[in-house]
From Swiss-Prot:
This is tRNA (guanine-N(1)-)-methyltransferase. One of its GO terms (biological process) is tRNA N1-guanine methylation. S-adenosyl-L-methionine binds at residues 117, 137-142. InterPro entries: Alpha/beta_knot_MTases (IPR029028), tRNA_m1G_MeTrfase_C_sf (IPR023148), tRNA_m1G_MeTrfase_TrmD (IPR002649), tRNA_m1G_MTases_N (IPR029026), tRNA_MeTrfase_TRMD/TRM10 (IPR016009). Its EC number is 2.1.1.228. GO terms for molecular function: tRNA (guanine(37)-N1)-methyltransferase activity. It is an enzyme of class 2 (transferase). Pfam families: tRNA_m1G_MT. It is found in: Cytoplasm. It comes from Acinetobacter baumannii (strain ATCC 17978 / DSM 105126 / CIP 53.77 / LMG 1025 / NCDC KC755 / 5377). The gene is trmD. Belongs to the RNA methyltransferase TrmD family.
């Protein structure tokens, strides 16, 4: 999958390309992550990419022209890589909140061009002409779009085929089927007086599966009750709940 990131701080994305699951995916050429600095497309000796906002106010606004040139360059790179469906995504507090359903849709794209804002944001005309989607990672403000962009890339990359060493691990993550994940345990059997639930050591896979589902359901009910209404339970899961409640 192809990713082009428009950012004033390309070095930050070594966290994606050099470490962990996403780093291994990059080394195996499952993903291609290219960072494009809009300063390279700015004019003048100082390569300015920001100016004061019309109408006054604090801070600076990223200028449309260097960003547009950077996006067009990213589109050329995507085309050269054989990618057809490559939306331009702007990471913004005004965007829709990123969730697992959106991530799974991104996986079907050939790639993404991700625009990272800075300062007070970017010129609205750039958004109107070049941005296909705006996404947020939550109702809070960060110094720029780089960290949200890394969240987006990491969440997509780990969903791609052949990236995870254990595909089942990705399937069982929180939110994949609408429920939170179940409690996890590893050695030793006892830690500070707390024991691993005996059922997890029983070797009875059907009982373990049932226990994990019930734990996930109860945890979601307690911590994120608004998610329960959207969960599509299987026939077996409904039976487990009925047995437990009745």
């Amino acid at each position: 999958m192809f990713f082009a990131v428009i950012t004033l701080f390309p070095e930050m994305f070594e966290a994606i390309t050099a470490y962990g699951i996403s780093g291994r995916a990059a080394k195996r050429d499952i993903v291609q992550v290219t960072c494009i600095n809009p300063r390279d497309f700015a004019e003048g000796n100082y390569r300015r990419v920001d100016e004061r906002p019309f109408g006054g106010g604090p801070g600076m606004v990223m200028m449309a022209e260097p960003l547009a040139k950077a996006i067009n360059h990213a589109k050329q790179l995507a085309s050269q890589a054989g990618c057809v469906h490559v939306p331009v995504v702007y990471m913004s507090p005004q965007g829709k909140t990123l969730n697992e359903q959106a991530v799974q849709q991104f996986v079907d794209y050939d790639g993404l061009i991700v625009l990272c804002g800075r300062y007070e944001g970017v010129d609205e005309r750039l958004i109107q002409h070049y941005v296909d989607q705006e996404w947020s990672i939550g109702d809070y403000v960060l110094s720029g779009g780089e960290l949200p962009a890394m969240v987006l890339l990491d969440s997509i990359i780990r969903r791609l085929p052949n990236v995870m060493s254990d595909e089942q691990s990705a399937i069982q993550d929180s939110f994949v089927d609408g429920l939170l994940d179940c409690p996890q345990y590893t050695k030793p059997d006892q830690f500070e007086g707390l024991d691993v639930p005996e059922i997890l050591k029983s070797g009875h896979h059907a009982n373990i599966e049932k226990w994990r589902f019930l734990q996930r359901y109860q945890r979601t009910l307690e911590r994120r009750p608004e998610l329960i209404e959207k969960v599509a339970l299987t026939k077996q899961q409904k039976k487990w709940l009925s047995d437990e409640q009745g």
